[in-house]
Amino acid sequence: MSGTRAYNILVLPGDGIGPEVMAEAIKVLRTFNSSSMQFHLQEELIGGISIDTHGHSVTQPVKDAAVAADAVLFAAVGGSKVDHIRRGLDGPEGGLLQVRKAMDIYANLRPCSVDVPSREIARDFSPFRQEVIEGVDFVVVRENCGGAYFGKKVEEENYAMDEWGYSTTEIQRIARLAAELALRHDPPWPVISLDKANVLASSRLWRRVVENTISVEYPQVKLVHQLADSASLIMATDPRVLNGVILADNTFGDMLSDQAGSLIGTLGVLPSASLDGLPHPGKQEKVRGLYEPTHGSAPTIAGKNIANPTAMILCVSLMFRYSFNMENEARQIEDAVRAVLDRGLRTPDLGGNSSTQEFGDAVVAALQGKY
């Protein structure tokens, strides 16, 4: 069809509640199909279900499909019968690590704002006093392809070791992305870089390269170096101090982004994006990305139609924003989710009695102006 923009998306539902929440995200995505925009979906196996079917947490054809796709939607893995005997890259979670590595999506972004998905959710579920979390607005930018998670490993009966290495090139590219993201705000957000330069050699290199890269190439961006453990304390006591772009390596970024979920009160509503760059504002271009909720596979509630699809639906919003440079559509989804939550339609984890499908249907109705 002439003038139709086509987007090829790889869909990886995975294990546990993954297929259920993914179905609702796809339902939302399909509402944007039109004469000018079409989404072509390819669904494949990953995680425990892939091990059960193929003997591997992810197959080479799936990794190839991820590299070829314009974007990847991933739900959850784990909770399978092989979890206790298959670990690392051989286990269910290893499939996701392999896909990230194959795609070279080196930057993981986890936004944290009291306004997304809903101020009402933060008010009702955050364990923090409202005056502590009021105004919290930051994004954790985590290096996604290096560090301890991908380094050499030794695991013996009485000794184990994880190599925690980084190169200058790996640090430079994530520092540049963090600075570019900071510049998208007016005035520019600060970049708060986390490390343990007082004890770790890799962190000393991290601090030096981040300093040299941002101070020279992005002088208009304020750069703050913060020890990671100190940042964790700040996040628990005065989180607005961290407003801006929090830049961290794979390990510290993983920890701090999960802690950020406690400010909102639940990981069940928070999406994340893993990218190989950022789109240029105002241009019709595609950036390779993988989008996943921050929650797990929740096998104890799988198949019961009670899982919360909010985070998975918001992954579609992030995909529109970062892979397809479609800010208006991204905001439409966020506004629709907020409208549904603020009117009290919630799944059991948020104190409601709505089903997974009912929540997805309500978001679609809100997008269509019928809610």
UniProtKB/Swiss-Prot annotation:
PROSITE patterns: IDH_IMDH. Its EC number is 1.1.1.85. The record marks 149, 196 as: Important for catalysis. GO terms for biological process: L-leucine biosynthetic process. InterPro entries: IsoCit/isopropylmalate_DH_CS (IPR019818), IsoPropMal-DH-like_dom (IPR024084), Isopropylmalate_DH (IPR004429). One of its GO terms (molecular function) is NAD binding. Belongs to the isocitrate and isopropylmalate dehydrogenases family. This is 3-isopropylmalate dehydrogenase B. The lineage of its organism: Eukaryota, Fungi, Dikarya, Ascomycota, Pezizomycotina.
